[in-house]
A protein has these predicted regions:
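Active-site helical microenvironments for divalent-metal-assisted chemistry
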Residues: 1-178
């Protein structure tokens, strides 16, 4: 237990360091680290998830995609399993955005259970954020498009965690109208 908690705190510190100069796209330019912390909170508080590897991966989920972190660095610091989960939920930023979004939908059914949990928490947090504090410049149409795309991703991996899926559905029910 003590070593699991230490690993979780190590992941939090690592993510905070890697994301230290990043901000969310909302009008308040919230500190980016709030997002990975929110994922871990959703997994624990709403999903009852206590798998340390999943929680660490949630905290680290955007480090490969949005920072200069390498998979090798994650493996050295957190082990192969956590690095693999993070890699499964990482988009290839070299691809055009539309292709990345399409691949997320396509691959959602094939990723590991652990990666599905992280992806589910990510989509819950993101659509809640879009509903409450949309990114600057996003009109209602763009917000609806994001909600609908997130639902297509989640629909491809239904059955992984019913409680979290209900949380996603509740968040999706707040889809902007218009």
């Amino acid at each position: 237990m003590k070593s699991e908690l230490a690993l979780l705190l190590k992941a939090l510190a690592f993510a905070a360091r890697k994301h230290r100069d990043q901000r969310r796209k909302d009008a308040a330019a919230s500190p980016y680290i709030n997002h990975p912390i929110a994922l871990a909170n959703v997994l624990v508080k709403e999903g009852g998830v206590d798998d340390t590897a999943v929680l660490c991966a949630a905290l680290l989920h955007d480090t490969l995609e949005d920072t200069a972190t390498t998979r090798k660095e994650l493996q050295r610091s957190f082990g192969t399993k956590i690095a693999a989960i993070v890699a499964e939920v990482t988009d290839d930023k070299r691809l055009p955005k539309a292709r990345r979004k399409s691949l997320q939908v396509k691959h959602a059914a094939r990723i590991s259970r652990e990666a599905k949990l992280v992806k589910l928490a990510d989509k819950i947090c993101n659509i809640r954020d879009v509903a409450r504090r949309p990114p600057t410049g996003w009109d209602k149409r763009r917000q609806r498009e994001y909600f609908d795309w997130a639902k297509r991703v989640i629909d491809r991996m239904r059955g992984v965690h019913p409680r979290l899926e209900r949380a996603f559905d509740a968040a999706y029910s707040k889809r902007p109208g218009g």
